[in-house]
Amino acid sequence: QQELDGVMLDDIDGALWAEEIIEAARVGEIPRMKRPIVAVGVDPSVSEKPGDETGIIVAVVDGAIRDMYKRHAYVLADDSLQAPPEIWAKVLAATAQRFGGAPIIAETNQGGGLIKAVLTGIDPSLKVLGVHSRFGKAIRAEPVVLAAQQGRVHHVGYWPLLEDQLTTWVPDETRKSPDRLDAYVHVLTALLVKAPEGLYGGTVRA
């Protein structure tokens, strides 16, 4: 259930994620991994609309599990923020550096070139891996939603703003752009569904 002004509400009709699914898989820490692969998903704010955020989500899987559909992903951080490119780029770089130079997963047709451009002047060693999709947000999210329903997506601790967006965004109805959700889908798709070329991962402890 969602809480709004102290009143508990049922799950939102049409929302892709249910709160009980997230809660059932929540953990306090990640398990020991043989070959952790960490990546940072980003959905950059490229518009001047007030309230638009840049989604920055970090997750890890055990790369020793070769079958991606058997992997479990652990969401480690939500560093999303509302800021102009010169600010969110610094936060994005700091997030990637904090996790051992973790690769950044970005959609090529939604600010991918901008991300590479702004990061070059901050830390040119950071790798930006582009992903491209011809489908809408809801279709892209489906494999990640399925993984969550299978109990394979674990939030390490609580990420209230991210979780609120996941459980309230309704395709074709919610007007606000789901920036955190998009970044979440980018990184979890790369780790659980289809890895972009060049994905090697960062480190959990940096």
Regions picked out by a protein language model, each given a short descriptive name:
Residues D11, A15, A39, I57, ...:
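Mg2+-dependent endonuclease catalytic cores in nucleic-acid-processing enzymes, primarily RNase H-like
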Residues Q2-V7, A15-I21, E107, V156-L161, ...:
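Short coil/turn segments at secondary-structure boundaries
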Residues E163-T189:
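Charged alpha-helix within mobile-element recombinases
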Residues V42-I56:
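An active-site-proximal beta-strand-loop segment
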Residues Q1-S45:
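ATPase catalytic-site recognition across NTP-hydrolyzing enzymes
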Residues V187-A206:
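Acidic two-metal-ion nuclease catalytic site recognized across multiple nuclease folds
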Residues E29-M33, S47-P50, A94-R98:
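Short, conserved, surface-exposed binding loops centered on an aromatic residue
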